[in-house]
Amino acid sequence: MNEIVIDTEFVTLGQFLKMTDAISSGGMAKWFLSEHDVYVNGEVEDRRGRKLRHQDTVNIPGVGRFIIIDQFIAQGGEE
């Protein structure tokens, strides 16, 4: 499972798709989610605005499996 480190409280699923190179621009997020199954914490998700937080898992078949890591929490901050 690949780790995606964020330095904010959350990222949206649309931002995440761009971070993982599943899409080349943010404008493609809506199309991508309508054409491909994306699983967040084991459930199909189609909302590009879905907030992904520390320890959320994302599975994009054909692209990869990912876990969200909050940089602050990973460095010993409180959750």
Segments predicted by a language model, with ranges:
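C-terminal structural segments of small proteins and small subunits
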Residues: 49-79
